[in-house]
């Protein structure tokens, strides 16, 4: 128990350094990072996802240029979406890595989407939520595609680059509850 507690503390300290380095340009301070990690730790205690996975993922998301508060909310939403689809902690970790790369690039492409579907996350519920958000944000119209076309061929529609980082971020924040 003592070693486990120390290991978690050590992980938290390393994560704080990484997150501060990734978010310094946003004016993020130690108190803000610590509060976000505490929130995720409390959340992790209530789910099958451990604090180590959460801190690794927040590091990935902040490295993609996302502010720490937004990243913490998105990680909770991602974990909720993973849990709702029955995704394992290991599957979610791999998908989170791929998603962080896509968020950094600004667009979720088919290969990124497949990383979600391969672990069971890219289901109809997620697709519907993303389509509704993209439609409300005007992203579909801006990319000359309709919600009906996306619903008809979700995977093929991703070639139109309508699934932006902003759409996915909004979806994950909503899923955070």
Which residue ranges define each predicted feature?
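Small-residue helix-packing and pore-constriction motifs in hydrophobic alpha-helices
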Residues: 1-44, 53-64, 73-84, 94-176
